Design a protein with these regions (language model features):
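A feature for loop-to-transmembrane-helix boundaries and adjacent hydrophobic helices
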Residues: 1-258
Length: 258
């Protein structure tokens, strides 16, 4: 783990910040490329920008709320983003609200639908999530619980407080699974005639992998019953994605048979 990438007189460049910025830049670039393929490059880029801003705000807010026992006594740390700490679920919900509002806002007759914009943004989102996991690996956030007896899945890693132990390699595993999901979405995006397929497939992939990763995490969070809040949210994401995809598929078949 290399928390600091570069340090000079009066200046410190954190690895977490660099990787996070790389993810954001990749997300915007891929949104523009997909928007151009779908004949709406400007709209896709605008949607990505607003979604990104709302997503960052939601991600930090979700992390602070999930760790309120700490931040209630260290409130200034809530604004210190470079130290690490973003909630994927808070970021997703914030971005989803922004995208929904943007798609519904009346602008022009050729305005793209929510589903088309969501398709354009999803590959970049998933690649950004991979960068986010790598950033957490460097900063120690979203760390795995202590474990043993799991070859290749248990590494000697620190938590966010710098305490090293044999832990589930949650962050590297999250990055790897996210990259696999990105490759699938990117290589198959031209094969599907259903608008919204990439977005909903992304929900299923991110929800199912998120649920599995939550089982390995050791960081503090909210619990709803005996499950981490992230487990519930991941399950809802995967089920909602599957249900909506089935609905879109049935509607697509009905429209083409009429």
């Amino acid at each position: 783990m290399h928390t600091i990438l570069l340090r000079a007189e009066g200046f410190t460049l954190y690895t977490y910040t660099v990787l996070l910025d790389m993810g954001l830049a990749c997300g915007l670039i891929l949104a523009w490329l997909e928007g151009r393929r779908l004949d709406h490059p400007g709209q896709a880029l605008n949607a990505a920008f607003y979604t990104l801003c709302a997503g960052i705000l939601g991600a930090r807010t979700g992390y602070v709320l999930a760790n309120w026992s700490y931040f209630s006594e260290h409130l200034p740390d809530a604004a210190r983003l470079w130290k690490g700490g973003l909630s994927w679920y808070g970021g997703f919900l914030g971005g989803l609200v922004a995208l929904t509002v943007y798609a519904a806002w009346p602008r022009r007759k050729t305005q793209p639908s929510f589903w088309l914009l969501a398709d354009a943004l999803t590959p970049g989102l998933v690649l950004g999530v991979a960068c986010g996991w790598l950033a957490c690996w460097m900063a120690g956030c979203a760390y795995g619980m202590p474990a043993s007896g799991w070859p290749w899945l248990v590494w000697d890693l620190p938590d966010i407080y710098g305490v090293r132990d044999l832990r589930f390699a949650t962050q590297p595993l999250g990055a790897a699974l996210s990259l696999v999901a990105f490759v699938f979405l990117w290589t198959t995006r031209r094969r599907w005639s259903i608008t919204g397929f990439s977005f909903l497939a992304g929900l299923i992939l991110m929800g199912s992998t998120g649920y599995l990763l939550e089982l390995t995490r050791g960081d503090d969070t909210l619990y709803w019953g005996s499950w981490r809040a992230g487990q519930w949210l991941s399950l809802v994401m995967a089920v909602a994605g599957a249900g909506l995809l089935a609905w879109r598929w049935a509607r697509h078949r009905r429209d083409h048979h009429d």
